[in-house]
Design a protein with these regions (language model features):
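Generic low-polarity alpha-helical segments
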Residues: 1-3, 131-132, 152, 184
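Predominantly flavin-linked oxidoreductase catalytic cores and closely associated redox partners
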Residues: 1-99, 111-112
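A general structural signal for well-ordered alpha-helical segments in protein cores
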Residues: 18, 69-72, 103, 124, ...
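Contiguous hydrophobic segments
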Residues: 19, 23-27, 34, 60-66, ...
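Electropositive phosphate-/nucleotide-binding environments in soluble metabolic enzymes
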Residues: 42, 65-66, 118, 122-125, ...
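Short, charged/polar low-complexity linear motifs in solvent-exposed/disordered segments
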Residues: 51, 67, 73-76, 124, ...
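Conserved mid-domain beta->alpha element of the FAD-binding
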Residues: 55, 94-162
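C-terminal helical "tail/cap" subdomain of flavin- and related membrane-associated enzymes
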Residues: 136-228
Length: 228
């Protein structure tokens, strides 16, 4: 379930969601490959990457109304792999308020998946750690519940500008003519640029939060709906 909030339309396929599906055939490959190919998916990308003794082959669509099953099966077939072990879901790709009605949200329920890549496990752990610290501070008597709600809301909201930039990238990518997109990718395929861009991407939700105290969040207006 996606938190309903004040908008009852915040449910698939009307909500800001991506749609992803992958298969897990047996096999091995040394490479991770991503295809930005409109014959596979008009708005999104296909992928293959190794995972132990199996492969992950899938299709992700930024448009939740685009059905990805047939194209996932076709991609697996084109790669000579069996379409078995299906796994997929809706992927919220827009950041939402992380508190509402006295409840703390982390992960998909708060829109913590990264909009351009749909990565969600790392971000769920990252915001989950921050949320857990606030809950612990309440249990230990260091904060009131309302203070913890406000602190966690501000922490999540302080990442909004990063999510907005990734969302802009998601919207722009399908509108770039494929040959131009290929040239842009080739031009950016330099170690210095790759290291710079990956480090910025990684630092959106760095695992260092486990051992380091997060930087104080900027002052943020907490919505009235945060309180129970």
């Amino acid at each position: 379930m996606l938190a309903a909030g004040e908008d009852p339309a915040y449910q698939p396929p009307d909500a800001p969601l991506s749609r992803g599906l992958e298969v897990h055939p047996a096999g091995q490959s040394p490479d991770l490959k991503v295809w930005i190919d409109r014959s596979i998916v008009p708005e999104g990308y296909g992928w293959i990457f190794p995972a132990g003794d199996e492969l992950r082959i899938g299709v992700g669509s930024f448009d939740p109304r685009f059905h990805v099953k047939d194209n996932t099966v076709k991609l697996a077939d084109d790669l000579g792999a069996d379409a078995v072990g299906f796994q997929g879901n809706w992927i919220p790709h827009k950041l939402r308020d992380a508190v509402e009605d006295g409840i703390f949200f982390a992960g998909d329920s708060a829109g913590h998946c990264l909009p351009l890549t749909a990565e969600g496990i790392r971000t769920a752990l990252y915001f989950g750690v921050a949320c857990g610290r606030e809950l612990r501070s309440v249990l230990e008597g260091d904060k009131t519940r309302e203070q913890a709600l406000g602190s966690y809301f501000a922490f999540s909201a302080s990442h909004e500008w990063k999510y907005k930039w990734l969302l802009r990238g998601q919207k722009i990518l399908p509108r770039i003519h494929p040959p131009l997109a290929q040239r842009i990718i080739e031009a950016g395929n330099r170690p210095s640029f790759l290291n710079w861009s990956f480090n910025h991407y990684w630092n959106i939700a760095t695992p260092d939060i486990v051992t380091a105290t997060p930087s104080p969040a900027r002052r943020t207006v907490v919505p009235a709906s945060a309180a129970a």
